[in-house]
């Protein structure tokens, strides 16, 4: 996009993405045209699993969760799926078994923390930093807090309240080989089907 920039007094060229993108490249640097009706991004678990119907909203029992935190440390999920949409397709995992138990106990609605494209999470796992917590540092110690703060701008922990593209699923929650274009949409839909 070529625009006049008063601060520089010149016409500048900027690379931008479509704010209404439904598909993006890794780290959201480019928009990708995605046909949302394409059967290749409609997994059977999403197409064939109906959403439960709750006629009276007063009957909802809601469980809120964060996509990454749900499975990031769950060793019953294959490592490459931890912290991703695809963890919700692992029905024998600790997390999914726990959700099934909650469902049997009356929980009937899952509320996800933001899953749209988030501005400040590095989508490539290799670019995500992990805090180096000093041995013996307590959870509320200054050392632990300093280690977390040192990588806060480059880690994968973020509640998601800094949207970049409202209509596209967050790429860091997709498995490494499925972060581009419609592939992350497919994995998001797999999660939805898995939760139903």
Predicted regions and their residues:
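N-terminal structural segment of carbohydrate-active enzymes
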Residues: 1-179, 185
């Amino acid at each position: 996009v070529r625009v006049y920039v008063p601060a520089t007094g010149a016409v500048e060229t900027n690379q931008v993405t479509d704010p209404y993108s439904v598909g993006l490249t890794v780290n959201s640097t480019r928009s990708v045209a995605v046909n949302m009706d394409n059967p290749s991004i409609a997994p059977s678990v999403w197409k064939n699993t109906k959403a439960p119907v709750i006629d009276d909203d007063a009957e909802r029992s809601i469980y809120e969760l964060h996509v990454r935190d749900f499975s990031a440390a769950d060793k019953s999920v294959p490592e490459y799926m931890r912290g991703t949409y695809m963890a919700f397709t692992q029905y024998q995992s600790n997390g999914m078994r726990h959700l099934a138990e909650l469902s049997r106990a009356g929980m009937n609605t899952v509320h996800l923390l933001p899953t749209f494209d988030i501005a400040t999470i590095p989508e490539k796992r290799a670019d995500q930093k992990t805090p180096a917590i000093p041995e013996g540092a307590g959870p509320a110690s200054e050392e632990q807090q300093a280690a977390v703060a040192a990588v806060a701008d480059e880690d994968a922990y973020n509640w998601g309240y800094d949207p970049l593209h409202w209509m596209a699923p967050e790429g860091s929650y997709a498995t490494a080989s499925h972060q581009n274009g419609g592939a992350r949409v497919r994995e998001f839909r797999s999660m939805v089907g898995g939760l139903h």
